[in-house]
């Protein structure tokens, strides 16, 4: 969350604590004096708190996210974030979970997880990233690579042109981004077995 002058002068100033790297949402009160703040990242269970605005102070000390936040948990999570640029010069962000105890001489099968439409993102830094609740086990421990990235048309903070790119083009531009993105992932991570590729997605 950021604040700026109502006259448009000066630069916007971020008021969300820098240490809380991840995904945030705010429900702001009518007079904008308070907000219900939600936060999580890939290694932090969701937290909620009431904060005052514009100073972003935690109204209830027991809900102080900064004190509860434990960055040391990061080291125990195998998820990594990445950025790729496709042959179409489209840059996309996502995450990858590599197999546990990887053998550098082996290649591993990959499961892509996609949505790539306006209702949401899959590549966010939020709790649950890197896990597939439909899989009865642990993909990483079972020797699979698990990957997602957000293509054009998703509500990524990349501006109107990005979000509106698939207007009247659903199933065309976003599907191409998935295909070209997969090629870029194969090029970036040479331990992926390109003969063993699976794709899972939702309504997109």
Model-derived segments and their meaning:
Residues 1-4, 177:
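Extended hydrophobic/Leu-rich segments
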Residues 4-5, 76:
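Short, compositionally biased segments
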Residues 5-9, 53-54:
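Short loop/turn segments that connect beta-strands within beta-propeller blades
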Residues 7-9, 21, 119:
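Feature targets compositionally biased, intrinsically disordered low-complexity regions
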Residues 9-17:
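Blade-edge beta-strand/turn elements of extracellular beta-propeller
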Residues 16-17, 24-204:
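Serine-hydrolase catalytic core recognition
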């Amino acid at each position: 969350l950021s604040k700026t002058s109502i006259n448009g002068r000066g630069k916007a100033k971020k008021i969300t604590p820098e240490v809380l790297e991840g995904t945030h949402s705010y429900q702001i009160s009518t007079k904008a004096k308070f907000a219900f703040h939600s936060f999580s990242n890939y290694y932090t269970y969701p937290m909620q708190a009431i904060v005052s605005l514009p100073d972003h102070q935690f109204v209830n000390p027991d809900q102080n996210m900064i004190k509860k936040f434990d960055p040391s948990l990061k080291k125990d999570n195998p998820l990594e974030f990445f950025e790729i640029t496709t042959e179409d010069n489209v840059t996309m962000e996502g995450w990858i979970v590599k197999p546990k105890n990887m053998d550098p001489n082996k290649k591993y099968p990959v499961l892509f997880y996609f949505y790539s439409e306006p209702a949401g993102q899959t590549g966010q830094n939020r709790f649950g990233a890197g896990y597939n609740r439909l899989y009865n086990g642990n993909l990483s421990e079972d020797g699979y690579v698990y990957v997602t990235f957000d293509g054009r048309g998703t509500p990524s903070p990349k501006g109107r042109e990005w979000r509106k790119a698939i207007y009247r083009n659903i199933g065309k531009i976003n599907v191409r981004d998935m295909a070209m993105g997969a090629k870029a992932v194969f090029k970036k991570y040479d331990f992926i077995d390109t003969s063993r590729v699976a794709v899972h997605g939702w309504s997109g």
